[in-house]
Swiss-Prot record:
Its cofactor is [4Fe-4S] cluster. [4Fe-4S] cluster binds at C408, C411, C415. Substrate binds at N65, M94, Y123, H162, S184, R185, G186, D225, G226, M227, R228, E264, Y291. This is Phosphomethylpyrimidine synthase. Belongs to the ThiC family. It comes from Methanococcus vannielii (strain ATCC 35089 / DSM 1224 / JCM 13029 / OCM 148 / SB).
Length: 426
């Protein structure tokens, strides 16, 4: 049984009750959203995961990517990133490790958080294939499905799988070349496999078998966008839309089989095209939860892409996206450090909160009211408690204090709130 099959049978699960309470919505309404495929709760039956709802009429969620690379393998560093994710309110974590003992790294990450854990299994397939055969493109089909099944057994809650990369989509890419080609790492693995062997993508060809594995463990399928644009010039081109049409068809097959599914979306999109991209996805994929990377709205800000992504992420979430994948200042430059994980996470949470306020989400608005109340009362500790990041403003206040403990050092004796407050007492 999966959350989806239970919902279709009219069963309200404990996970649904938990999410409904967190979101402050009626649990039967939530069950109907899950039944329609508009909401997913990524929770593998083999792991004690905090239930998190992702989808329409819920708060916008934020994911943190972390993991090793061939150039930097330090499990203690990755666990610090997990700790930061836990502390500062991530809703999910994806382990994208490609260096070191991948199963051990994944195991340690899962032991140190109760948040939903996602992976991109084709990374491990590529690493194993390179070690075994000397090249990623020599990966065999048994290895692909064995890795997926093993990760499902370990308790991975959701998996990004690039099932929409097909011979047809590769042909579209070749006929209508783009500026930057394929920038998705998993998408590149499978594109290269198709081009070299002239074979269909096993994840697409044997999709029903894949669904059997995922359904057995209630792993949520996150349909990867292997043809996502890697620069603004490539946004919303034929390759991207061709793949999206395929993903929409696969969403139908997931729902028919009782497998929870969400769809991943583009990463580099001009601001004026974001709303259209969200509407196209929601239409083609029949309101499946939409998971976007950013989107980044300019390619001119390496070192500041947590900001470019937050700008795009806000409009994306207002326009239909349900799940924001954070972007750190290190994006396009190097592997992120621990502090940059925090910066990226907070930036994405700002985007999510701003979007939820714009959409009238009652939980988001309640937090805004609480902050206003705390500011009216000059209750600094309460303000820090409510803030998305409590530590930074507290430190800043201590660095340049005001003589008046109620005021801050910007205005001091000339604080507008205090001035009007004093007049009101007369």
């Amino acid at each position: 049984m999966t959350q989806l099959t239970d919902a279709k049978s009219g069963i309200v699960t404990e996970e649904m009750k938990f999410v409904a309470d967190e979101e402050k919505i009626d649990v039967n309404y939530l069950r109907k959203l899950i039944e329609k495929g508009y909401v997913v709760i990524p929770k593998n039956i083999n792991r004690k995961t905090k239930p998190v709802g992702i989808g329409d009429n819920l708060r916008t969620k934020v994911n943190v990517n972390l993991g090793t690379s061939p150039d930097f393998i330090d499990i203690s560093c990755e666990l610090k990133k997990v700790e930061i994710s836990n502390k500062y309110g991530a809703d999910a974590i994806m382990d994208l490790s490609t260096g070191g003992n991948l199963p051990e790294i994944r195991s340690q990450i899962m032991k140190n958080t109760n948040l939903p854990i996602g992976t991109v299994p084709i990374y491990e397939v590529g690493v194993d294939s390179k070690e075994k055969y000397g090249r990623v493109i020599d990966m065999d089909e048994d290895l692909i499905f064995n890795v997926i099944e093993r990760q499902a057994q370990e308790g991975v809650d959701f998996m990004t799988l690039h099932c929409g990369i097909t011979k047809q989509s590769v042909d579209t890419l070749n006929k209508d070349p783009r500026k930057m080609g394929v920038v998705s790492r998993g998408g590149a693995f499978l594109t290269a496999y198709i081009m070299y062997h002239n074979k269909e993508n096993p994840l697409y060809r044997d999709f029903d078998y894949l669904l059997e594995i995922l359904k057995e463990h209630d792993v949520t399928l996150s349909l990867g966008d292997g043809m996502r644009p890697g620069c603004l010039q490539d946004n919303t081109d034929r390759a991207q839309i061709q793949e999206l049409i395929t993903l929409g068809e696969l969403v139908d097959r997931c729902r028919e089989k009782g497998v929870q599914v969400m769809v991943e979306g583009p990463g580099h999109v001009p601001y004026n095209n974001i709303q259209a991209n969200m509407q196209i996805q929601k239409t083609i994929c029949k309101n499946a939860p939409f998971y976007v990377l950013g989107p980044i709205v300019t390619d001119l800000a390496p070192g500041y892409d947590h900001i470019t992504a937050a700008i795009g992420g806000t409009l994306a979430a207002v326009s239909g996206a349900n799940f924001l994948c954070y972007v750190t200042p290190a994006e396009h430059v190097r592997l992120m450090k621990e502090e940059e994980v925090k910066e990226g996470l907070i930036a994405s949470k700002i985007a999510a909160q701003a979007a939820d306020v714009a959409k009238g989400n009652p939980v988001a608005w309640n937090k805004e009211r609480q902050m206003a109340d705390a500011r009216i009362k000059h209750d600094w500790e309460r303000q820090f408690e409510i803030a998305l990041d409590s530590d930074k403003p507290k430190k800043m206040r201590e660095e340049i204090p005001s003589k008046d403990e109620k005021a801050c050092s910007v205005c001091g004796d000339y604080c507008a709130l205090l001035m009007v407050e004093e007049l009101g007492k007369r």
